[in-house]
């Protein structure tokens, strides 16, 4: 997710700096690949081994917010909200902590590192619930 996030972000920053649509198209291709290929197993962002995975979701969220809000690419909002909804529904409800595998319920009291716990809150901050 990190590589996709930074590719999307770099493409968007180049698009904003130059106005060249090719860069926006590249960002869209990166977002589409993340959503349609990397996330196809559960229709959720994938997680790999490593303690830093959750922060990658936060970085992805930052650049997806730029793609959605600054570039009008709202087709990603349902996918992003699905991740939020699954991650929050499967949190450790005693502590309200989310883990990195959004499709799995968190075991109450289990160790959840701060990076893993950061992904869903980052998405929630950038893509708040509809009122």
Q: Where are the regions a protein language model picked out?
A:
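Extended, leucine-rich alpha-helical cores of fungal transcription factors
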Residues: 1-3
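Inter-helical turn/loop segments and adjacent helix faces that build the functional surface
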Residues: 14-21
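CBM-like carbohydrate-recognition segments
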Residues: 22, 27-131
């Amino acid at each position: 997710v990190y590589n996709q996030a930074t590719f999307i972000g770099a493409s968007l920053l180049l698009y904003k700096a130059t106005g060249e649509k090719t860069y926006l198209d590249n960002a869209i291709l990166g977002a589409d690949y993340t959503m349609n290929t990397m996330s196809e197993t559960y229709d959720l962002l994938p997680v790999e081994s490593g303690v830093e995975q959750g922060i990658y979701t936060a970085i992805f969220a930052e650049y997806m917010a730029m793609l959605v809000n600054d570039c009008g690419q709202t087709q990603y909002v349902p996918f992003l909200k699905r991740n939020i909804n699954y991650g929050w529904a499967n949190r450790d409800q005693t502590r309200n902590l989310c883990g990195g595998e959004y499709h799995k319920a968190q075991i109450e009291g289990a160790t959840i590192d701060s990076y893993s716990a950061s992904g869903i809150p980052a998405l929630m901050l950038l893509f708040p619930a509809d009122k």
